[in-house]
Amino acid sequence: MVQVVSQENFADSIASGLVLIDFFAEWCGPCKMLTPVLEALAAELPHVTILKVDIDSSPRPAEQYSVSSIPTLILFKDGKEVERSVGLKDKDSLIKLISKHQ
């Protein structure tokens, strides 16, 4: 299951391993369409942590990583940004993006 993290625990959440963060907002249509894709991805890739950050309730991480459009997906490896994707993506595209960093 994909969980929402807050700005208070964001840094700890990305500190180790492969972590895909979905920057989203409740009012964003494409963000809502991405949710089932991320749930399927989480089931298929259990070694990758997939989390969401609501940019309205937790704006600091979005500002820190210069997120200007949503949905924005950022892949972190051991706390460092290694990939970024903006907009709605399908599961296969996300698997390719992640597989480059395993």
UniProtKB/Swiss-Prot annotation:
Name assigned to this protein: Thioredoxin
Family annotation (CDD domains): TRX_family
InterPro entries: Thioredoxin, Thioredoxin-like_sf, Thioredoxin_CS, Thioredoxin_domain
Gene Ontology CC, one term: cytoplasm
The organism's taxonomic lineage, starting at the top: Bacteria, Pseudomonadati, Chlamydiota, Chlamydiia, Chlamydiales
Signal peptide start and end residues: none
Stretches assigned to the Thioredoxin domain: 1-102
Function per UniProt: Participates in various redox reactions through the reversible oxidation of its active center dithiol to a disulfide and catalyzes dithiol-disulfide exchange reactions.
Record-level Gene Ontology MF annotations: protein-disulfide reductase activity
Family, similarity comment: Belongs to the thioredoxin family.
Pfam families: Thioredoxin
Disulfide topology: 28-31
Keyword Hydrolase attached: no
Recorded coiled-coil stretches: none
